[in-house]
Regions:
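Hydrophobic face of amphipathic alpha-helices that form TPR/SEL1-like repeat modules
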Residues: 3-10, 28, 44-53, 84-93, ...
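Structural signature of tandem alpha-helical TPR/SEL1-like repeats
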Residues: 16-24, 59-67, 96-105, 132-141, ...
Length: 252
């Protein structure tokens, strides 16, 4: 029944029918069957997703939060780790912003193996968001996540090393990060959100362009710099605009 729900919701091997998918998920969540017990966390996560996206049901952030809390089950490693990480993201947004809650859920998810949350934790430690600033813990999380393929973490490592004038290290990581700009493929490979992957590649591309433009840590190459500036603008215009402003003000 769970598989049927997913297939109908996402249109896998059948016509997309989100309403029917939601119906199946609700049946699993409300079932007393022992066979359905291990699927309840996944069903609650997917139902939360449906309410958050307003797909198959009326949009409700509050109902999405309630269902994700059920799916996350107080950080239980056998529950939905995806829900734990998603709650971390949810509490970092303006509508329900609570950075302490965000840090808590990313910590739980990271402890249960979430690659996405490991990268976000690194950023939160680095800038003291929801927790006291701790550069050592930040680098531990960012390096660990980057080694496991977290592009967002790689982008922030590039920024960290560039700002501390370790230009060759920043450029080396940036070159590796920008080798693949197929965001959808990277999202499937790492199970990380495409939005954050795009931000990570855009950050790396902009700092690499800056290194090439000014000859910092690499040989000066204006044509290559232009290429990477364009990549950053294409992948995340907001990130590129923010970094361009910092560059114009002489901060980077």
């Amino acid at each position: 029944m769970y598989q049927l729900g997913v297939m109908h919701y996402d249109g896998l091997g059948t016509n997309e029918d989100p309403e029917k998918g939601v119906e199946y998920m609700k049946k699993i969540l409300n079932s007393d069957s022992s066979k359905a017990r291990h699927l309840k966390f996944a069903a609650a996560y997917n139902l939360g997703r449906a309410y958050y996206e307003g797909c198959g049901v009326k949009h409700s952030t509050e109902e999405a939060e309630r269902l994700w809390l059920i799916a996350a089950d107080h950080g239980n490693p056998k529950a939905s780790v995806k829900a734990q990480s998603t709650l971390g993201m949810l509490y970092s947004m303006s509508a329900l912003k609570d950075l302490r809650k965000s840090f808590f859920w990313h910590s739980e998810a990271c402890g249960n193996g979430s690659l996405e949350s490991q990268g976000v934790l690194g950023v939160m430690y680095l800038y003291g968001q929801g927790i006291r600033q701790n550069t050592k813990a930040a680098l531990e999380c960012l390096k660990g996540a980057a080694e496991r393929g977290n592009i967002y973490a790689q982008g922030h490592l590039v920024e960290y090393y560039y700002n501390r004038k370790f230009y060759s290290t920043a450029a080396t990581i940036a070159m590796r990060t920008t080798e693949n700009d197929d965001i959808d493929m990277l999202a499937k490979m790492t199970d990380c959100l495409p939005t954050y992957i795009a931000k990570g590649v855009a950050m790396a591309a902009f700092y690499l362009a800056r290194c090439l433009h000014l000859g910092r840590g690499v040989q000066q190459d204006q044509a290559a710099a232009k290429k990477y500036y364009s990549m950053a603008c294409l992948l995340d215009p907001d990130v590129a605009s923010d970094l361009e402003l910092k560059a114009n003000l002489g901060r980077i």
